[in-house]
Amino acid sequence: AGITEVALKNHYADKTNWRKMLTNNVEQIDLVAERLKVENLIPTEVQEYFYSQKNDLYEMHYPVLHYPSKVNSLSLDKTPQFQGKLTGIKGQYLLFEDGTVFNIRGSEGYIVNINV
């Protein structure tokens, strides 16, 4: 693990709750306050690499028409064929109208045909 990762692992979880993310049940965070907190946790030997611009915030907007209330993960091993209406994309996930979500990265190595 890197120097920064080791320093931050006791303060931040390294896992995103993907089910909460895909139902849009996410906690709002004050990113400016978090940046200040992280800046104080970064070890001295890597502080020169810390981007410390105070006001640069970027907001990501994902094209999602409808978030499901409950998600059902699509496994190509269990369900080799699937048909559904795409209602959104969030990160590496495709979201479908019936609550099915497809993790693109989790299906690396598969050959997938998509018909639109």
Predicted features, each with a name:
Residues 2-116:
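Conserved RNA-binding domains used in RNP assembly and mRNA/RNA metabolism
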